[in-house]
Design a protein with these regions (language model features):
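Alpha/beta enzyme core
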Residues: 8-24, 80-95, 141-149
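Glycine-rich, proline-tolerant flexible connector loops at the mouths of alpha/beta enzymes
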Residues: 24-53
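Structural preference for beta-strand elements that scaffold enzyme active sites
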Residues: 24-26, 59-63, 94-98, 120-126, ...
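Charged helix-capping and loop-helix junction motifs
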Residues: 39-48, 77-81, 137-141
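Catalytic alpha/beta core domains of metabolic enzymes, predominantly
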Residues: 102-159
C-alpha cells in the first residue's frame, strides 16, 4: 500500500514498488482528501488524485477510506462518489476502487455514481474489523457476494 499523503512521494513509492516487482499499487487518498476537503478546497482533491492515477507507472487501487473503518476521511459519501465517478470517467481511471460495503449499502448516491461508471474498472467491496476475527465473517462474505457489481470482496481483520 502506498499512502498518498503527498502525490509526488506516492508516485516515487509506486516507481520503487514496480522496480521491486509489484504489478499493482494501492493509493490511500483519504488523508489527502480529508485535508483538502476539510480546508474547503475539495476541487483540488479531484485534480491531485486525478494526477496520481494518471501518472502512476502501475495500475492502481484507489481507496478513500472512511474513519469508521480505519481511514482518515470524515466527509460524506456524496463527495466520495463524485471523486470516484470523475476518475472512472477519466482517460486514466484506476484499475480498482475500494469502497466499504457499509457505505455501498447505505449510500444510493455512491452506488449510482460509482456503479454506473465502472467500465473497465473493478469494484472492491471491503469490510474492516480491527478488534479481531468477526463472529459474522461468513454471513458478511455472503452479504457482500450478493452485490453483483463487486469484482473483489475483501475482509480485513486482526487475527
Amino acid at each position: 500500500m502506498v499512502e498518498a499523503g503527498g502525490v509526488e512521494g506516492a508516485l516515487r513509492a509506486a516507481r520503487d514498488a514496480k522496480a521491486a516487482g509489484a504489478d499493482l499499487v494501492e493509493f490511500r487518498v483519504d488523508p489527502l482528501c480529508e485535508a483538502l476537503v476539510g480546508s474547503g478546497v475539495g476541487e483540488s482533491a479531484f485534480v491531485e488524485v486525478g494526477h496520481l492515477c494518471g501518472s502512476s507507472v502501475l495500475p492502481c487501487v484507489l481507496t478513500c477510506r472512511v474513519e469508521e473503518e480505519g481511514g482518515a476521511y470524515s466527509g460524506d459519501d456524496v463527495w466520495r462518489g463524485e471523486l470516484y465517478g470523475r476518475l472512472l470517467g477519466s482517460e486514466t481511471p484506476p484499475r480498482y476502487v475500494d469502497v466499504e460495503v457499509s457505505a455501498w449499502e447505505r449510500s444510493a448516491a455512491l452506488r449510482e455514481r460509482v456503479g454506473g461508471s465502472l467500465g473497465e474498472c473493478g469494484l472492491i467491496l471491503s469490510a474492516h474489523d480491527f478488534s479481531g476475527v468477526p463472529a459474522s465473517l461468513f454471513r458478511d462474505m455472503e452479504r457482500m457476494r450478493r452485490h453483483g457489481e463487486a469484482a473483489v470482496l475483501k475482509v480485513a481483520f486482526r487475527a
